[in-house]
Amino acid sequence: HKKIIYDGFVETLGEHVAIDFYIYNNDFALFKKLLGNAREDYSHFVIIPHFIEGGENAHEIINTIPRHKLILLDKKVPGVNGEYGAVYENFENDIYNALEQALKQLAKYHTLKIIFPEKSYYPKGILKGFNRFCQEYAFTHKVVHDIAKEPINSGEVYINVMEADLVTLIERLITMKYKIGKHIGVISYNETVMKKIILNGITTISTDFHQMGVKAAELILSGAKDHIEVPFKLTLRASL
């Protein structure tokens, strides 16, 4: 999905803008090193601040960037102060609202499980929204760290955030007698073209990544310091 963000960003900025693209693989130590060595003549720093571990002090290094040059993308970072641009997801509310929209389909299941690796760059706000929804609507619920070892039973819905976990889940499901969308439900984070086809269509919950890139570019072009929350969408398909 980062490629989709980048494409929207580049298309909106136009061909007369030079972009240096740095990949830090969600490694905070590498991120800190890259930012420390970055050229001072950049007009802007557009940062996607997701870290697998060690990012608790990310605000300290980000706060060294002049505010008029800073745009945070996908996630806001507590402790980053001053006036700067941001285009972000509201992770807690997004999953809560998406599941609420799917209540009719979820009603035939009794248990919701979210596959969330212990070491993940995905924000814990996702788990807060998931737990809040399940508690308010009386679903049995569980956070699963390793889907390869998790018992799978009829009446359960599985929500994945990592693509690798979706592959493992599907590999297990196709060997079982359960019918997807009847006995077992599947919801996947982040819309892709393939999810329209796999299992006759996988239900997705996803932000508009292209729009995220477009809005970030518009902040640069306009010089605005707005904080823009990107819409989040539920796409219902046969897997639920």
Where are these predicted regions, by residue range?
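Amphipathic helical "hinge" segments at domain boundaries
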Residues: 1-37, 41-43
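Short, solvent-exposed amphipathic alpha-helices that sit
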Residues: 2-15, 94-101, 121-139, 168, ...
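Short beta-strand elements in bilobed, periplasmic/extracellular small-molecule ligand-binding domains
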Residues: 13-25, 82-85, 111-114, 127, ...
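Periplasmic-binding protein-like
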Residues: 42-51, 71, 113-117, 154-163, ...
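Flexible loop/hinge segments that line or gate small-molecule binding clefts
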Residues: 49-93, 190-200
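Hydrophobic alpha-helical segments within soluble ligand-binding/sensing domains
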Residues: 53, 76-113, 166, 206-225
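An alpha-beta-alpha
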Residues: 94-135, 228-240
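Flexible loop/turn connectors
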Residues: 152-154, 164-240
